[in-house]
Amino acid sequence: RTVIHAVKGAGFAVYEGQSVAIMGSNGSGKSTILAAIAGLLPVTNGQIYAAYEPRLMGVGAALLPKVSGLRNVRIGCLALGMSSEQIDELLDSIIEFADIGEAINRPLRSYSSGMKARLLFAIATSIRPKILMIDEALSVGDKEFRAKSESRIQEMLASAGTLLMVSHNMAEIRRLCNRGIWLEEGVILADGPLDKVIDTYTKGK
């Protein structure tokens, strides 16, 4: 059996109020790092410490395809630890933010990737997370939704929230992040101010 080490000694610390872009080639270990921080993948070596529960939002996040968007909102909120009373209070604002119209009552399997992204983001940020991790999820939304999502992320960062983001969209990264980490084959090649890391990454690709 071949053992593949997706991430190799990639140690770093992220502080409140920081917004970090993790960039690198496909298969470099970016998504693996986010999944490990979220507790979705076991860590075979080293430790992960977080002051708050990290919330991961990705295009492959678990939603139930056979039930309605509305039902998925309730299930997603329960998974985030909300009470039924909290869900009832937030339900209208989540539906309004997702802005998918009557589709909220249709089975999720009928949704486009953009509609799923809208619903996921609305659920994930309904209670402002202190640590939000985004794995390419904003890239599938339309321009209007991305602008609305970025505005909510900026609000979160302004209140000392923390963002870790995987994206190949450099314009999006520049708008949202102030620090960059370049990862290749599970190894950190650069870590520092965003513009400097983007420059190093672009030249080294």
Positions of PLM-derived features:
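ABC ATPase nucleotide-binding domain signature region
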Residues: 16-21, 25-79
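H-loop/switch region of ABC-family ATPase nucleotide-binding domains
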Residues: 167-168
